[in-house]
């Protein structure tokens, strides 16, 4: 029988499993990622987030449709049958009263509200005497119940025709008739039927007008070995657990249609990646970085904590951390002119930094240093996540495998070398992954907020049962990693090296 793997046809026996089909297609996937199978389409009826409010006026029946943006607004609308239009002005229409004694809410005064917004107001501060208000123009509203609102999406012209006394007869959900794609999660050992379409990954085409945000997405993928972990899922979007990133610019603000990928550029969720499942209007806090070209159905069935394979077009073009020979091969692969500055073997910086800008300019300038000037380190991100994030931020390694440290002081006779940190950020570092009995030579650590010199970064040059890499006692020390290669080079440094730049390159592997 014939099935399809990521769009490609594959012939397999009748009793074949998902695993058999993947092997026949030459496709391998990690055991911990989610896979789906698309079975076809079916006609369905489903409720939407909109409610139809029916009003009676004489022999005529009027209909208004409100898109509900909060569950409590649905509960308010359920109380409307029997209520009447109590007043109309050139600015607003009020229906009620309605009893909302069972709802939790807060009230504010003088809140600016757009036209044709449905809100709840509490003019007497008595929840049994609340009113459902529809605005006709932008206006400041008094005694508004915050976070209980909706939008009039149909029947706006009728709002202006209401004169008072019209009665709400009933409220009903708006039902959509749609064609629904039948998709289900599967395991590698599940059986298949003829025509099944196996989806193993999501393919994203990057937008050329969001190079910085796209690089953040590419870095997140690279650090997670091509997999993204689902953080949150709603009917509107699926969000991805991000790598930390700061100071994202506003770029390529556009419509958030189904399949659009965005990165939040501000706020507490800065850096979070979103894939939209339903259309939404543009918002300045979201940069559109790409569009799902294949595999959107997989994101319709994932759950929080799932991992999905993701590929991008184009893939990341990052030279930092490569040898000069590797950099030349990469430049040739993508038809990019390579300009090498400096004497050495290891690329420690590149300009432009962003993949999309490199491909746009078809030229990249890289800075190289001798390999023996680059210290290789392993970071313990799982054991000390906040401290490792701090280290990457200080060294500018949030999106690159190579960073820079400046020597603060080097005393071989004291058994440590200390590098400059960021005192302001360091004061926010809580104790985590403190040493227990001893600190071995090569251990990398930072001073936490328990000590005056919070934020200093250090490497232990010899074992100690008393002091950490920055010379602090164990309660003031957060262990963040170890030196894998180059400890001898650090031992050669002394006070004449104060202020010198030391390059560090992260290697990932088993401890």
Swiss-Prot record:
It holds the Pfam family PASTA. PROSITE patterns: PASTA. InterPro entries: Cyclophilin-like_dom_sf, Methan_mark_3, PASTA_dom. The lineage of its organism: Archaea, Methanobacteriati, Methanobacteriota, Methanomada group, Methanopyri. It comes from Methanopyrus kandleri (strain AV19 / DSM 6324 / JCM 9639 / NBRC 100938). SUPFAM superfamilies: Cyclophilin-like, Penicillin-binding protein 2x (pbp-2x), c-terminal domain. It comes from the Archaea. This is UPF0288 protein MK0796. HAMAP family: UPF0288. Belongs to the UPF0288 family.
């Amino acid at each position: 029988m014939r099935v399809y793997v990521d769009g490609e046809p594959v012939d397999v026996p009748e009793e074949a499993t998902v695993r058999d089909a993947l092997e026949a297609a030459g496709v391998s996937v990690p055991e911990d990622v989610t896979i789906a199978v698309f079975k076809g389409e079916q006609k369905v009826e489903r409720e939407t987030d909109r409610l139809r409010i029916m009003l009676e006026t004489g022999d005529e029946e009027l209909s208004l449709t409100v898109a509900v943006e909060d569950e409590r607004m649905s509960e308010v609308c359920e109380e409307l049958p029997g209520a009447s239009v109590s007043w109309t002005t050139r600015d607003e229409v009020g229906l009620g009263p309605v009893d909302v004694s069972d709802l939790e809410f807060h009230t504010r005064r003088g809140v600016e509200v757009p036209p044709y917004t449905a809100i709840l107001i509490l003019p007497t501060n008595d929840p049994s005497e609340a009113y459902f208000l529809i605005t006709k123009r932008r206006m400041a509203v008094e005694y508004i119940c915050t976070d209980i609102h909706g939008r009039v999406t149909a029947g706006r012209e009728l709002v202006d025709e209401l004169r008072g006394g019209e009665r709400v007869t009933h409220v009903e959900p708006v039902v959509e008739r749609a064609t629904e794609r039948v998709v289900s999660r599967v395991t590698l050992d599940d059986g298949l039927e003829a025509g099944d379409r196996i989806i193993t990954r999501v393919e994203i085409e990057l937008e050329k007008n969001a190079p910085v945000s796209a690089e953040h997405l590419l870095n997140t993928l690279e650090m997670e070995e091509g997999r993204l972990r689902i953080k949150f899922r709603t009917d509107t979007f699926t969000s991805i657990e991000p790598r930390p990133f700061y100071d994202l610019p506003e770029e390529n603000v556009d419509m958030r249609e189904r399949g659009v990928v965005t990165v939040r550029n501000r706020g507490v969720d800065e850096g979070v990646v979103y894939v939209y499942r339903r259309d939404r209007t543009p918002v300045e806090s979201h940069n559109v970085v790409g569009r799902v070209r294949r595999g959107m159905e997989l994101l319709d069935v994932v759950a929080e904590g799932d991992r999905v394979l993701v590929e991008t077009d184009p893939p990341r073009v990052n030279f930092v951390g490569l040898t000069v020979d590797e950099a030349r091969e990469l430049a040739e692969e993508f038809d990019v002119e390579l300009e090498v500055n400096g004497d050495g073997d290891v690329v420690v910086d590149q300009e432009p930094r962003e993949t999309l800008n490199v491909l746009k300019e078809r030229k990249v300038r890289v800075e190289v240093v001798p390999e023996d000037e680059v210290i290789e380190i392993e970071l313990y991100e799982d054991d000390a996540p906040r401290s490792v994030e701090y280290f990457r931020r200080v060294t500018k390694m949030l999106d690159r495998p190579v960073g820079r440290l400046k020597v603060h002081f080097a005393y071989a006779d004291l058994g440590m070398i200390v590098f400059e940190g960021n005192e302001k950020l360091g004061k926010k570092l809580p104790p985590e992954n403190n040493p227990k009995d001893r600190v071995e030579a090569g251990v990398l650590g930072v001073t936490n907020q328990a000590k005056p010199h919070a934020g200093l970064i250090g490497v232990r040059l010899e074992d100690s049962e008393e002091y950490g890499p920055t010379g602090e006692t164990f309660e003031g020390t957060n262990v963040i990693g170890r030196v894998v290669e180059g400890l001898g080079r650090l031992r050669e440094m002394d006070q004449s090296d104060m202020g010198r730049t030391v390059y560090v390159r992260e290697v990932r592997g088993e401890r």
